[in-house]
Amino acid sequence: MPSITTAKREYEERLVDCLTKYSCVLFVGMDNVRSQQVHDVRRGCRGKAEFIMGKKTLQAKIVEKRAQAKDASPEAKPFNDQCEEYNLLSGNTGLIFTNNAVQEITSVLDGHRVKAPARVGAIPCDVVVPAGSTGMEPTQTSFFQALNIATKIAKGMVEIVTEKKVLSVGDKVDNSTATLLQKLNISPFYYQVNVLSVWDRGVLFTREDLMMTEDMVEKMLMEGLSNVAAMALGAGIPTSSTIGPMLVDAFKNLLAVSVATSYEFEEHNGKELREAAINGLLAGSGSAAAEPAAAAPAAPSAAAKEEPEESDEDDFGMGGLF
């Protein structure tokens, strides 16, 4: 049997070798995972990845020592800094090293997910007890009453009238809920090796990053493109997405000038468009063009009304002087 020092040295050599040989490290949670699941995951990752467990204090020392070495690789120090900043080497976690796509490893982990009954103190997901016959005798209605579940007796069996949510995300399972779910043969939990973070080619992806879907990324890109196009349109910068609206706006302005000045341009049916704009037969551009046309004739008439008033005031003022 090797000594403790020898075992630690061999473990350090293996961990450093994995950190050097593989470009991707998956930090995985091992809470409530059984030894058989770990064995199955190791077997499923064979040829694709290496799965390493161990004391986190020892792992942290090895990673720090590797980063401080004179011949340290460029990614050694950033990896150590990220591990310290996000406290990655802590708790009940394991390390999976791979050069393959992350999706290949997560598919292996998902393939070894195991159903489990509710346990007292566990933090669950949403659990709904469905309506219908339970197969339980009327003497056991107290379990349902404790959880405010409406029941009735039908054909000598307890029947749930309407479905009832008994657990929500963040709740802790109490004795009554755990007992009832076991009697109803409901196993609401799934335990598996769960990916917490991923270090891939010098970039750390947190759990929130990993939860993003392709639809979410596509939505963000479309919103960004829309904002850029709106800024370009507002600033008058022609782009492939703004050149069309800019040409339409320019043509509307030309049509408005045509209506206001009685000038008819021959191109693009200018005469017909001008008449249609005056008669209010154009949608959008017609109303925009008609407004300047209506405002233009009104201006001279207003000026004509103001001129006599000014002349009257001048005459009154001169008469007062003489």
UniProtKB/Swiss-Prot annotation:
Single Gene Ontology BP annotation: ribosomal large subunit assembly
GO terms for MF: large ribosomal subunit rRNA binding; structural constituent of ribosome
Comp. bias (Acidic residues): 307-316
PANTHER family membership: 60S ACIDIC RIBOSOMAL PROTEIN P0, LARGE RIBOSOMAL SUBUNIT PROTEIN UL10
Keywords (A to Z) from UniProt: Phosphoprotein, Ribonucleoprotein, Ribosomal protein
Origin species: Leishmania chagasi
Biological role stated in the UniProt entry: Ribosomal protein P0 is the functional equivalent of E.coli protein L10.
Subunit structure: P0 forms a pentameric complex by interaction with dimers of P1 and P2.
GO CC terms, sorted: cytosolic large ribosomal subunit
Domain of life: Eukaryota
Region span, Disordered: 292-322
Protein name: Large ribosomal subunit protein uL10
UniProt gene name: LCP0
Family from the record: Belongs to the universal ribosomal protein uL10 family.
